[in-house]
UniProtKB/Swiss-Prot annotation:
<dbReference type="GO" id="GO:1990904">
    <property type="term" value="C:ribonucleoprotein complex"/>
</dbReference>
<comment type="subunit">
    <text>Part of the 30S ribosomal subunit.</text>
</comment>
<dbReference type="GO" id="GO:0005840">
    <property type="term" value="C:ribosome"/>
</dbReference>
<dbReference type="InterPro" id="IPR005290">
    <property type="entry name" value="Ribosomal_uS15_bac-type"/>
</dbReference>
<dbReference type="InterPro" id="IPR009068">
    <property type="entry name" value="uS15_NS1_RNA-bd_sf"/>
</dbReference>
<comment type="similarity">
    <text>Belongs to the universal ribosomal protein uS15 family.</text>
</comment>
<protein>
    <recommendedName>
        <fullName>Small ribosomal subunit protein uS15c</fullName>
    </recommendedName>
</protein>
<dbReference type="GO" id="GO:0003735">
    <property type="term" value="F:structural constituent of ribosome"/>
</dbReference>
<keyword id="KW-0687">Ribonucleoprotein</keyword>
<dbReference type="GO" id="GO:0006412">
    <property type="term" value="P:translation"/>
</dbReference>
<dbReference type="Pfam" id="PF00312">
    <property type="entry name" value="Ribosomal_S15"/>
</dbReference>
<keyword id="KW-0150">Chloroplast</keyword>
<keyword id="KW-0934">Plastid</keyword>
<dbReference type="GO" id="GO:0009507">
    <property type="term" value="C:chloroplast"/>
</dbReference>
<dbReference type="InterPro" id="IPR000589">
    <property type="entry name" value="Ribosomal_uS15"/>
</dbReference>
<keyword id="KW-0689">Ribosomal protein</keyword>
């Protein structure tokens, strides 16, 4: 599997920017999630990787909720560019 096929244009644009920014972390978590979901198409019973996927999903969800609280405009722009669903508010 080629890692570069999962790295989006957004990740390339933000490579020069701050790697500690919330947006960059969300993009990198999204790339990891997409890589793991394609891995599960072949390896359905890889339970340790499924646990890792759930952990990454939780981290991304926490970062998305933080970004939604701090800057709603950047949050909306990021989820539209990454093509992910908006989180449900409680």
């Amino acid at each position: 599997m080629v890692k570069n096929s999962f790295i989006s244009v957004i990740s390339q644009e933000e490579k020069d920017e701050n790697k500690g920014s919330v947006e960059f972390q969300i993009v990198s978590f999204t790339n990891k999630i997409r890589r793991l979901t394609s891995h599960f198409e072949l390896h359905r019973k890889d339970y340790l990787s499924q646990r890792g996927l759930r952990k990454i999903l939780g981290k991304r969800q926490r970062l998305l909720s933080y970004l939604a609280k701090k800057n709603r405009v950047r949050y909306k722009e990021l989820i539209s560019r990454l093509d992910i669903r908006e989180s449900k508010t409680r």
